[in-house]
Structure formats: C-alpha cells, structure tokens
Amino acid sequence: CYLIRDGQMKGDHIHLFEKRSIPGGACDGCQYPGIGYVMRGGREMDDHFEVMWDLFRSIPSLETEGVSVLDEYYWLNKADPNYSLCRATENRGQNAHTDGKFGLSDQGCMELIKLFFTPDEQLYDKRITDVFDAEVFSSNFWLYWRTMFAFENWHSALEMKLYLKRYIHHVGGLPDLRALRFTRYNQYESMILPMIRYLEGHGVRFHYNTKVTNIEFELTEGKKQARTICLLVDDEAERVDLTENDLVFITNGGCVESTSIGSQDQPAVFNPTLRPGNGWDLWKKIAAQDEAFGRPEKFCSDPEQTNWMSATVTTLDERIVPYIQNICQRDPFSGRTVTGGIVTARDSGWLLSWTFNRQPQFRDQPKGQLVGWIYGLFSNTPGDYIKKPMRDCTGKEICMEWLYHLGVPENQIEDLAEHSANTVPVMMPYITAFFMPRAVGVRPAVVPEGAVN
C-alpha cells in the first residue's frame, strides 16, 4: 500500500507471494466448512497506532461510499467507546474485584521503574524473572499486563521494557482496558479485505498457494544482492530471478507458523515442525548465508516456551448467553461493546481469558448467535474441570472448561458445550516467539548492512 500511495509505484509491478489460499496472515477470520468460525487471535488497537491509521486513511471503506476505513473506525469508537466492567473473575464466574487497583507494593513499583530506565544492553538475554520477583508477579498489574500482551515469566526482560515504553499510555487504563479500540467486525473483514480490494484495484498481483522456500543472495565485499526467489507453487518448484533494481520485502519468521486447527470433536495438534515454505525455515536458510541476516534459532528453538492456544466459540442458542451477560453486564446482542476486552479467570489452571467483541463478528453470522474468543497461556497444565492439558482437549472440552469458569452448574456443562456451542481450538507453537530473550544482532536490521535490493 505504501509503495503505491507514497512510492508512486504501479500496482502491476508488485507481486505478493502467499502460501495460503487467502491473504491476511495472523489477521484472520473465516468460516471453515464443516468446522465453524475461526479467529486465531485479535487486534488490540489504540489511538497511537499512528502508522497504521495513516495507512487506513487511504483505504476506502467497503460499506460506506466516500469514506475511509479510518473514518469508520473513528466514528465507531467515538460513539461506542471501549471499557470493561469486569476485567477478572474467580470462584467460577464471580467478579474478582480487582477494582481498578494494581496491587503493587513500593518494592514492586521500584522494580518496574528500574526496568524502565535500564539500558538495553544490560537486558540482553535476560528473562523477566531476572528483573522482577513476587512483588510484581503476584500483583494485579502483572495479571492485567501478561494476559493483555501474552507475556510469560520466562520471556525477554528487554522486550518487557520496550513494551512498557511503547504502551506507557496504556498503564492507567490497564484495569478496565479503556485505552483499547476495536473494529466493527473481525480483523479480516474490517481491515484485510478493504486493503486487498485497494491493492487489487491498483493491479497488484497476488500469487496464492505459493511458498517461498529460499532467497538466494550474491554476497560480495560490502554488498548483498538478492538474486533468486525459490518457490513451491502447488508443490512444483519455480525460480524468480532478480536484479539490483528489484525490491524484496521478506517476512522472516511468523507468529502463526505451524498453526494447527482442531474442531468441536478433535484437538488442535501440537506440531512445531518447520517445513519448506514455513517462515522460520525460510529465515534459517537466509541467515545461513550471512550473519547480518540474524539468528532465527533464538526465537524458534523452544516451542514449549513460545506457544499458547486459542479457541473460537459460537453460541448456537440462548442458553449460554445469560452467563456471559452476568459477567460483562451488557447485552451481547446490542451491536455495541460487550466485554470491552478480555475477561481473565485468574484462578484458572490454563490462565484462561475470553472476550466477545461487537456482534455480529462476521457479516454472515446467523442472527441469534454470538462468536467469541478464548485463549489460554498455559497449554500444558491440567484444567480445573477438564483434568487434562488444553492442548489435548477437543473444542467441546475447552468449551466445558470455559463454561465451568463462567459459573454454569456442573450438571449442565457438558450438555451446553455439546448442543449450545461450537468451539474450534487452534494451537500456535510460535505465537510468542518474538518475546524470547535476545541480544543485539539476533534480529536483523530492517535493511541489513550492505543489502542493495
């Protein structure tokens, strides 16, 4: 989009290689035939995503003629501001009464302040546990922060510091998420589709079902030139030759790589294998050519520490709705804000959080149904009602665990999960790979030293 708008490049000079049959990457939202609605994750946005909103001021709305996606987004959140009436529960759906408090001691506050002002180089390869102790980890602040951003205790202290600095304006709104903004529908329909229509309208060429398996560089003293893009197109090998006048933009790695999708009756398999065409495999092959291209193994070598799971739940009738409404204290069918961001079951073995955004979440969503999202930070610990790890659970079993934490009577849980909901689990082995401890040089520069194209 920037190449077209700001770079004045002709659209038919731009080629996008996409390994899936649809675009959007992690910004997804679709209905799989025979499985149901699936959203792997969601975007928590705010007023200070300046680059993003600068882009969407130029992307026309698909719903309202003559206005931009940014216009729609601004008007929507002005008329229906986001905030939560219940940020956390405990004891099976009871308000945890965090009551807007951070619960930080003086020592905990000092640990946060010290981290904020620590030079980056002193945090290289350090974990969050190296800079915080129980004064922070037992606080409401850490509950709010870790579940909002999906930080684990073993993640990078440097990344924690960078997030604190980038989202300092969120701190006051952490207890009720009032700094967040959301789109009308799921992220794919509200953001990706308008962008794709804009690009298609300018003649950009999309190549779907096309895996990039390698990019071969010619390396000479002080110069790195991408010479060939190696492709698998419907499993047939192809090569695209490049010149110094071409520009190559690479997605190195990827948080939703090796994703597996289950169903109401099947678990989502944990399979972190890196195959040709996978973003991590591609980055490894590029990095093997020169150290300036980074060290992907720092991020993708321990999927046990970079995974979590989500599930998309669709209510099929009215029986679950009162339990949702009891917690969020709003009418889920109003078309306005429902939970106002995630609700965390703070005493959940999976550290389960869930949310229902404005309904319908999909344009074709049947009337009378709700589509929500659940995620668990701990995929390998037993549940509280379902006594096995989340990664081993079917969609129905994940729904049962969620219903337990909503406060549904135990003698109704299985019936509601089976007949009143459809739940689709998703396992993402590398979803927090970018949070792993790191040092300088592990991530390549946006334009690596000596790169010419």
Model-derived regions, located:
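Short, well-ordered alpha-helices that flank and scaffold nucleotide-derived cofactor binding pockets
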Residues: 2-5, 197
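Glycine-rich FAD pyrophosphate-binding loop
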Residues: 4-31
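Short, solvent-exposed loop/turn and secondary-structure capping segments
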Residues: 26-29, 159, 259-264
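Rossmann-like flavin
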Residues: 62-169, 180-182
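C-terminal segments that line or cap access tunnels to active or ligand-binding sites in enzymes
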Residues: 170-183, 245-247, 252-453
